[in-house]
Amino acid sequence: MLANESVARCCTGLRRDKIRPPLRSLGVRRLTESFKQGDPIRWRLGVCAAIAMALLALVPQFHLWASRGKDWQGTFVSFDFDEVVYASYLNALTSGRPRRNDPYTGRDDAPNQPQPESLYSIQFVPAYVLAMPARALGLPSATTFILLRALAAFLATLALFWLLMLITGDTQLAASGAIAVLCLGGLAGEPRDAWRILTFQGVGDSLPFLRRFVPASVFFLFFLFAGLVWQALVRLAPQVRLTYAALAGLTLAILIFSYFFLWTAALAWLFIVAMLWLIVRRGEPGSVIAVLGVIMILFAAALWPYAVLLSRRDSAMDASQLLTHSRAPVFSFPVIIGLLVFLVLATAVWRGWLRWKDPAVLFATSFALLPAVAFNQQVVTGLLLQPVHYGRYSANYASVLAIVIVAGLICRARASGSRLPSRVLAFVTIVIFSWSALENGARAYRLGPQSRARDDARRVAMRLRELSQQAPSTQISDQSSSLVFCSNLWLGDALPNDAPQPVLWTPHLFIFPGSSAEENRERLYSQLYYSDVDEEQFAALAREPSFLQLAVFGWERMNQKPYAAPIVDADVQKETNLFKDYLTNFNAAQAARTPLGYVIVPATNGSLSNLDLWYRRDAGERVGDYILYRVKLR
């Protein structure tokens, strides 16, 4: 009665017989009170935190703008090797090309030449969400990516703020926690990054979730999904529960067609929450099953067309995405962090500070256990697909989120229900935010020469775009007149960000199904041959981490992952012998298999002795630091 009287005094105007019994969870009680009071200030800190994170996300771009000044050519700063591929696919869609397209080979889906599904055409939602407004506004892919980086940070911060506010009921903790999760999530992905901090070294990209356009564009949906599931489980009215469950199911359905490593992580997390809820809170199985049923019905409805698209994928897609068969467990850094958090949580329950039945405790437990489940699903399924992505884009953030929730719950329990001191939260937040800003600024400074070189090289892509607009509409699809050889591989990789012409070979050519594994190898050898690479240089590149080692042996073997076979001398010698045979037998017929239309070389080092044996070059056109040639077969 005393508890009910207390609630009645706080909720004036309500009849005593209409007041529901108070919820045991402090987070749920505060949530209920905030809804009744309608306090408009509770979002103010969240919006401020989101704006701060958006500005933090743009620090590298600010650095490029300041260093280039009026010479800026419109390039976006990139910290991730794969961003140029997403920008190329986005540019293709913005240019009106079909969903199944290959921006590197220039091959599009057509009735007389159907293309198989690719990773990008299956996960099409983010691409079209960006491409449609970009096309309507006439925005190039680079500008879209710049805007997306800020918007993604803003939305992710707001989603995290909302989720933490639901769980903890503490607005200040929610704002500080959102910043902490986003700034420290990258650090939780790799143990070597923690060591670099202790030794005052740079940790690299401290905000990996901002990789564009995935997971950046849909990253916030993971936390939105968790918040909707919370609402569906803790709300009292059945109709409200089912409404939130339906919204959660729709969010999960969108994630399915957005990014594999987010929707599978969300599904694994939902499984953990469901098991915890059914085991610990046995008194409400009917409502929990109803909520899960609604979510799973919508999930299954989306999974069916997804499976159909997946069945139409290219046969080489599994190999290009490094799908392997293994049941070996993986103990990554996020897994260790999550298990340690779970141990702390269990200790707090054992000491009587917390209770398992508290929904906030169950949610903290679910986030702590998510890395162990996500990284080790192969123990059950037998399939292992690039688990490193869980460590960069989902499980690492879940482990830090668990730390924030557990820290807030324990501190509140030890302080007899009072909130964490505002000054402590402010100090910790400022330290974390300042460190992340320093890391982003330092990395932008270190990569400044590369960013400026990419920006200057964009002149070449824009010149090719101009030439395509001057050419007949059928010429671009004709590889004999438009195929580009670029001796600078990183420039060639980025050319399709703006230019519609296909390229001979780039490190990302294998990603799309436009070329088979055999054609990809043929194009690689041609690229090396025209670049005057001999067998000794080939062997040297194959022995060390390089674009060649990546192309020949794959990312996971190059990075010496424990579940991948090591690269030994016999492997290098075998590949070198194959390339040597190619050099020895190269002839006019092989040159004609992939006829070139354009050649791009640096203005200071444009040796093309092998290419000149088979092609005639025009006088060339100086474009920035490069020379653009038009070539024809002899």
Predicted regions and their residues:
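Hydrophobic/aromatic-rich transmembrane helices and adjacent perimembrane loops
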Residues: T264-W269, L384-R414
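Start-transfer (signal-anchor) and selected internal transmembrane alpha helices
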Residues: M1-V7, C11-S67, Q172-A175, R634
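Transmembrane alpha-helical segments
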Residues: L55-L64, L303-Y306, R423-R452, W505-P507
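Transmembrane catalytic cores of multi-pass membrane glycosyltransferases
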Residues: D82, A253-N376, V380-P387
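Active-site lumenal/periplasmic loops and adjacent helix-entry segments of GT-C-fold
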Residues: L56-L221, F260-T264, G441-S451
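Short hydrophobic alpha-helices at membrane interfaces in multi-pass membrane enzymes
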Residues: L26, L228-A253
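Signature aromatic-anchored transmembrane alpha helix within multi-pass, membrane-resident enzymes
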Residues: P22-S25, R30, I51, L292-A300, ...
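Extracytoplasmic
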Residues: E83-V84, A442-R634
